[in-house]
Amino acid sequence: MILASREPRRHWPHRLTLALALGLLGAPAFTQAATPVPDPGAPLPYVIGLHEAYLTADYWAARLDNADAPILDRAQIEAQNARMRAQDKHIQDIATLPAQLSAGQVRDSITTLSSWPARALYDDKGRAIAPDVRSAIEANLGLDAVPSQVSPDYALVVKRAALRTFPTRQRVFSTVGDTDIDRFQESALFPGDKVAVVHRSTDGRWLFVHSERYSAWIEADAVASGDKATVLGYGAKGPYRVVTAATAHTAYTPEEPRVSRLQLDMGVRLPVLADWPVAEPVNGQQAHASWVVQLPVR
């Protein structure tokens, strides 16, 4: 189902498509010794080790004391989010970006981040970053190519991707032999994250994006563009699931490799098709013990 009908302007990322994927259910492990373990009933005959009760929240909640006690109610969550947005200058609402940005605004956003450090930098072999390497990295910013007016394009992240200080994979370090912290690594974005694209690198492989939490460079093949309403509306309504484990993965599905074994990190929120027919497969896979979720793809 193609949701973006127009071709991206200025050769922005591939058009956005939403695909279905199976999110595997992991049985949470709890150690509430004082709470008796409920009887899960007879196992299902067609899936080894699976009981129907395992697929319900009630079964797991019954193993906990005070399972229904809220940590934060809706009003408290909204208040905390409001404080975060007010106090953290990096939190931004990309929905409120103007339809046109001046070249100066775009360049300022880029150069505020992409400023070469005054200290010496080394590669992973302990060699100082050569002047010609630095020049090539800085030239790839493409600042002279920013048009006088820029219309932000909107996109969804399709896979876990690094946010970088400069449009390069070149890893740099402050100390010879200490390669724990890459000084060009800023943050990361995850499947379903929404971004506004305002510039492309000279080599065409990187995009400068604004996300809710950060503005930085992301590899172009990690995002799929769509119209603003579709991108901002993704997952905004209807049922959803939030990953609470360190990571989760979609099911292996060779029929749709774009969403096969896709890593989903803690905090990722995806729209779920709660009314998916039990007997109907998803990408050739039986969905009985999984959540059927929508994921953006290129």
Segment roles from a protein language model:
Residues 29-33:
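Sec/Tat signal peptide C-region and signal peptidase I cleavage site
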Residues 199-204, 275-279:
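Short, charged beta-turn/beta-strand-edge "cap" motif at the junction between a beta-strand
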Residues 1-12:
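N-terminal secretory signal peptides that target proteins for export/translocation
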Residues 34-164, 169-180, 210-250, 254-257, ...:
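Boundary regions of SH3-family modules and the immediately adjacent low-complexity/disordered segments
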